[in-house]
């Protein structure tokens, strides 16, 4: 029987040259951070609209997140350094 785990919160610390989000988990990840690659990420903008992304890479304590909207050239309202994103585990 699999148990439902709480999502992991992460704080946006920057962006890379491909406009992907760089985020650090707010608590230590017990498993190998690479186990989060492929997991769904949700950001709620200031209007409560959910924006979905995916963890693409894990580099030490930084996760690289790609949002479909940003890849399509769309800006996500309010997403910036210090924003909170949630990773489903």
Show the residue positions of the predicted features:
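C-terminal structural segments of small proteins and small subunits
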Residues: 63-89
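Short coil-to-beta-strand transition motifs
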Residues: 2-7, 45-52
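Short amphipathic, basic-aromatic surface patches that mediate peripheral association
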Residues: 27-30
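Short coil-to-beta transition motif at edge beta-strands of beta-rich domains
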Residues: 33-44, 78-85
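Short, solvent-exposed secondary-structure boundary/capping segments
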Residues: 19-24, 61-69
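Ser/Thr- (and often Asn-) enriched beta-sheet segments in non-cytosolic proteins
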Residues: 42, 52-54, 86-88
């Amino acid at each position: 029987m699999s148990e439902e785990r709480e999502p992991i919160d992460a704080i946006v610390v920057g962006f890379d040259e491909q406009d992907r989000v760089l985020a650090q988990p707010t608590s230590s990840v017990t498993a190998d951070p690479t186990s989060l690659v492929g997991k769904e990420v949700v950001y709620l903008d200031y209007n409560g609209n959910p924006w979905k992304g995916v963890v693409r890479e894990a580099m030490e304590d930084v996760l690289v997140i790609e949002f479909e909207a940003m890849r399509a050239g769309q800006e996500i309202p309010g997403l910036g350094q210090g924003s909170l994103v949630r990773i489903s585990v």
